[in-house]
């Protein structure tokens, strides 16, 4: 899995600094060549780039400008800080302690993410659920000790996956659970929030241009140094070294979710990690992948999984109600592609696709 994630990061970064088009069978060849032929404008700028493994994925931070190294160093420290704060797998983290003690006064970051998680749950009619963690544990996704739970167990655990049972005071940042068995996981928005924090750091250090790739969660700062938009690959859900399209963006997060990211097979059936809070089982929505493009990395992260759970028809209707906040690329199980009109002029693909209009 680590090698696959690293390959994805290389693919996306290569596209982001190159001018290559959308990918077919020669996508890997094109992007490899592009790494050697990065345009001279980017080469001439002062560049700093670092890679780190955090939040169970490889992350790359790249910045251009006179303060690029300082900005990247500060960004790497911020990634490590947020990982230590939010990880459910680290018993010393704020969230792990909350899950044990069932109440806490949260940090500013933790409180912000809990509040956003609650808001996203309301916004998506429960498709986004930070309280789903006990169900995820039963499936074995956090520990990779995979198993298919029985129906009775899932039915009981779903009673705990209820965001309305989280008591949270936004002013004091005090939080508690109404049910002693409840636990939360902020992983569904943590990387998106982290990329947004890095954008704040880039602004603080006044870098000219920048890009972060947090395990496939991409966010761009300004344009490339030559003034052109970043070209961000939309990864293929069937081959991490290929891509299904390219979107040209500046100052945007581009975040993709799909069942291909984490899954296991039992008795000939594949079970992926995107759990539908309504059923407790992996979502069967007819979608292979969902890509969200937004100014807000936290929102993009949360909606990428939420729209995957909704399925194509509900996702399109949801976007029409929130078209000023994000755009999308949907790929269905039968390889039909749908994109929202807000990115139609900036998206290219070898797939045929239908543009969804807001009206």
Language-model region placement:
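Mature catalytic core of soluble alpha/beta enzymes
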Residues: 2-359
């Amino acid at each position: 899995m680590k090698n696959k994630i690293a390959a994805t990061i290389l693919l996306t970064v290569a596209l982001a600094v190159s001018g290559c088009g959308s990918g077919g069978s020669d996508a890997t060849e094109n992007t490899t060549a592009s790494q050697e032929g990065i345009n001279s404008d980017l080469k001439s700028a002062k560049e700093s780039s670092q890679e780190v493994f955090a939040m169970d994925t490889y992350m790359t931070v790249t910045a251009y400008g006179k303060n690029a190294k300082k900005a990247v160093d500060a960004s790497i420290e911020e990634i490590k800080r947020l990982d230590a704060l939010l990880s459910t797998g680290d018993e010393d983290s704020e969230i792990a302690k909350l899950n044990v003690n069932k109440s806490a006064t949260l940090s500013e970051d933790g409180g912000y993410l809990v509040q956003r998680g609650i808001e996203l749950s309301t916004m998506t009619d429960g498709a986004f659920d930070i309280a789903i963690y006990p169900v995820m544990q039963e499936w074995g996704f956090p520990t990779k000790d995979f198993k298919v739970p029985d129906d009775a167990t899932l039915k009981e655990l779903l009673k705990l996956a209820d965001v309305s049972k989280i008591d949270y005071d936004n002013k004091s940042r005090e939080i508690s659970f109404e049910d002693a068995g409840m636990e939360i996981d902020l992983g569904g928005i943590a990387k998106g929030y982290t990329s947004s924090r890095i954008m704040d750091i880039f602004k603080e250090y006044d870098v000219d241009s920048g890009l972060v790739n947090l395990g496939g969660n991409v966010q761009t700062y300004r344009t490339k140094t030559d003034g052109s938009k970043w070209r961000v690959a939309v990864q293929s859900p069937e081959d991490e070294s290929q891509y299904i399209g390219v979107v040209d963006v500046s100052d945007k997060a581009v975040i993709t979710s799909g069942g291909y990211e984490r899954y296991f097979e039992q008795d000939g059936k594949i079970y992926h990690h995107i759990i539908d809070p309504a059923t407790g089982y992996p979502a069967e929505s007819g979608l292979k992948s969902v890509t969200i493009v937004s100014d807000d990395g936290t929102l993009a992260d949360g909606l990428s999984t939420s729209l995957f759970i909704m399925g194509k028809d509900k996702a399109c209707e949801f976007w029409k109600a929130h078209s000023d906040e994000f755009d999308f690329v949907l790929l269905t199980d039968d390889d039909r592609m749908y994109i929202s009109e807000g990115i139609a002029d900036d998206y290219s693909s070898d797939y045929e696709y239908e543009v969804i209009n807001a009206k």
